[in-house]
Amino acid sequence: MNATLTSLFNIFGILGTLLTLAALLIWIERRLLGFWQERYGPNRVGPFGILQVVADAIKLLTKEDWVPPFADKLVFILAPTVVVIATLLAFAVIPFTPYIGIIDLNIGLLFFLAMSSLSVYSVVLGGWASNNKYSLMGALRAAAQMLSYEVFMGLSLMGVVMLAGTFNLREIVAAQQDMWFCIPQFLGLVVFLIAGIAEAHRLPFDLPEAETELIAGFHTEYSGMKFGLFFVGEYLAILLISALIVTLFFGGWQGPWLPPLVWFFIKFSFFVLFFILLRAALPRPRYDQLMAYGWKLMLPLALLNLVITGAVVLALDGT
């Protein structure tokens, strides 16, 4: 009974924390973008505008729950929920500390890759069900982009698996006791970081929803809370990729003096802020440049990292 209560507390505690962080991240991003662009961010609702997110949520909840008459109603309604559920499920295998985490899977890394793949269905179904040419074009862009960069993401993680000898995320963190994998796996880290940005549809890789080209991409026809779910899903993806980078390459919760959860949060916050800085600093490339960049540069780098890591592991095992 106690084990069940502990598990439920973990699940709902982590779920509530993640949704709160996603909402807080929206406010932090808007404030930082305002600061970097020398303008005011949200500063009217609550102290420093921190309640602006609550005001936006109320606005979305009170909007008419409208479905276009030409849309496939059932698929149109279900699509936004898929991205949020898939992203939250991927968090289930993240070990925040030795004791805080939802489930300890031996195939945790594969589970993450499987859940991140499900997000593609949400985008494609949402674009297709809208029965709008801009939505469909955005959905097809997103499918090609996400499927392509998932290949590079998966290959970049195989070097970590070779060094740790496991797909279990807790054991991968434990394997970094002496040295974080960001040093021997620097190439893998670079590839994973760039692929993660593309998976989350963040600038400079937000081409599926490029406003100047496709109005709003795959969620052009969405409004109200259905649009809000896509919006929350994007920020949850930022949190997920940041948490994975910390876990796989920067020793997870490990660090001197401070409690494990504090160390995890410090590293995690750094990468979340890095995602926001990218939005402020980089332009959006053309779609053909994005795909060429992936297949002509990212794939060779991921394969090179795999070959070098395999050779080093084999040589060390031989000695």
Swiss-Prot record:
Known role: NDH-1 shuttles electrons from NADH, via FMN and iron-sulfur (Fe-S) centers, to quinones in the respiratory chain. The immediate electron acceptor for the enzyme in this species is believed to be ubiquinone. Couples the redox reaction to proton translocation (for every two electrons transferred, four hydrogen ions are translocated across the cytoplasmic membrane), and thus conserves the redox energy in a proton gradient. This subunit may bind ubiquinone.
Membrane topology: Multi-pass membrane protein
Predominant location category: membrane
Pfam families per record: NADHdh
GO cellular component entries: plasma membrane
Keyword Calcium: no
The reaction(s) this protein catalyses: a quinone + NADH + 5 H(+)(in) = a quinol + NAD(+) + 4 H(+)(out)
Subunit structure as annotated in this protein's UniProt entry: NDH-1 is composed of 14 different subunits. Subunits NuoA, H, J, K, L, M, N constitute the membrane sector of the complex.
Keyword terms of this UniProt record: Cell inner membrane, Cell membrane, Membrane, NAD, Quinone, Translocase, Transmembrane, Transmembrane helix, Ubiquinone
Identification of the protein by name: NADH-quinone oxidoreductase subunit H 1
Domain of life: Bacteria
InterPro entries: NADH_UbQ_OxRdtase_su1/FPO, NADH_UbQ_OxRdtase_su1_CS
Protein location: Cell inner membrane
Organism: Nitrosococcus oceani (strain ATCC 19707 / BCRC 17464 / JCM 30415 / NCIMB 11848 / C-107)
A biological-process GO annotation: aerobic respiration
Gene Ontology molecular function terms on file: NADH dehydrogenase activity; oxidoreductase activity, acting on NAD(P)H, quinone or similar compound as acceptor; quinone binding
Class of enzymatic activity (EC top level): translocase
